[in-house]
Amino acid sequence: MTTEAASMGAAGATAATASPPGKWPSARVAYYTLFVLILSTTCSQLDIAIVPYLGPAIKADLHLSDYSFSLMVGVSFGLFYTAVGIPIAWLLDRFSRKRLLALAITVWSLGTAACGLTQSFAQLFIARFFVGAGEAVNGPAAYSITSDLVPRERMPRAVAVLQIGSIGGPAITTLISFFALTAFLHMAPLHGPFGPIRGWQLIFILVGLPGVLIALLMLFTMPEPKRHTIPNQVSGVDETRRHIGGAILQVFKDYGVALAYIGRHWKVFAPMFGSLFISSLGTGAIAFQAIFFDRRFHWGPARLAGLNLIPNFILVPIGLFIGAMVAEHFTRKGRADAALLTHIIARFVGLGAMFGALMPNPWAAWALFTLMIFSIGLGGPSQNAAFQIVTPTELRGKMTALYLFMYSVVGVAFAPVITGFISTYLVGEGNLKMAIFLPTAIFGPTSLVITLLGLKPYGREVERLKALEAGAA
């Protein structure tokens, strides 16, 4: 997600829309801050990306059905996000974002490592409860900090740079999975403090512990940029009330301000929230990919991880680059809706992925799943940048938390449950292909239509904000 500070500007920014000089961090500071945020975002993605590859082994060792596996993958994660994510976002808008994020990195890293010590479904469920801190805090904090590194017209490329972390996590995890599954999956159990440590458990430990080092790096070396606001853009946010007493009531008050702002601009935000909500319901295929290929085509997780190195390390970076270039092309053409339009194009590119589960041979199925991964790289940064562009700085933590709630809770937590439920209770676990196909075929096109309906209102809102910013300069 993100971008170049003063010297990283989009080529098409005009004098009329460019932000006044001197307000933003230097290129050196912006680059280093983005580097640390990329490490943080990569770390937050590691556990999410690695669990599908470990799925067959976890299911076999703990004797889980598809539905039980989906609960472990998703619901345990979503519980923490729901309970803590919204209050944390309130804190992000008031206190040091980097300190809160460093604490969160420590919590989710130790939670990931703890997954490697569990001996039952209940223990693994509880350990993953703490891993939810990753998405609960990292997304709003990283986006909020990034938005104060560069002016609005440069946000799409800035978000594209930060997106390297979101893509880098799965890519690095795929690489780790390939070697770790090959080396450890069938090894004899080690003697652990709470019982035997099998191959999949050792991988959790190896993935989790390095996050503590990233937390220390952030805490002691990363600067936090000054917050930038547009005067009189939002009223009702108490910026001085920082004492503990009355904080809970203030949380509700401030979220009320955020919801009121969304309500006043519902033509802009309703399609954005609605489309993300609907599309997230169809993402359960991600959690079941390794199980699907293992069950239907007898491709082991190590083989799948090796093949997925191609899209994660080659196609996704290409998608990130092309997406940023497309967004800047539309910006040079004077399109105020450039970021959202780029995301829509990527969504059309990825539509064919819904048929992957129905393919009769593994190579065709894998190719279509790969198309989905490429489209995420192509349009993901623009989707996130589009939201940040129209979100007031003083509400950015709270509104980003609400927005990411749609994916982190609905997508990561409950989409796998939909797929698992269909597989176990409706079509049978021997027909997993239909359990994967049905949600993607229903929710994917529906969410795309909703996004299209919001394109014109979004463009008008960007123009309004540019006028406000020019008047405040």
Regions found by a protein language model. Name each.
Residues T17-A27, P225-A270, R296:
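Juxtamembrane intracellular "pre-TM" segments in multi-pass secondary transporters
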Residues V51-P52, Y261-V316, L320, I376, ...:
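Extracytoplasmic gate region of multi-pass secondary transporters
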Residues P52-A83:
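Extracellular/periplasmic helix-loop-helix junction of adjacent transmembrane segments
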Residues G74-A89, I310-G323:
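Central cavity-lining transmembrane alpha-helices of secondary-active solute carriers
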Residues A83-A122:
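Conserved MFS/SLC helix-loop-helix module at the cytosolic interface between two early adjacent transmembrane helices
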Residues A127-S166:
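Cytoplasmic helix-loop-helix junction between adjacent transmembrane helices
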Residues L162-E224:
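Helix-loop-helix hairpin linking two adjacent transmembrane segments in secondary transporters
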Residues A336-Q383:
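C-terminal transmembrane helical hairpin of 12-TM major facilitator-type secondary transporters
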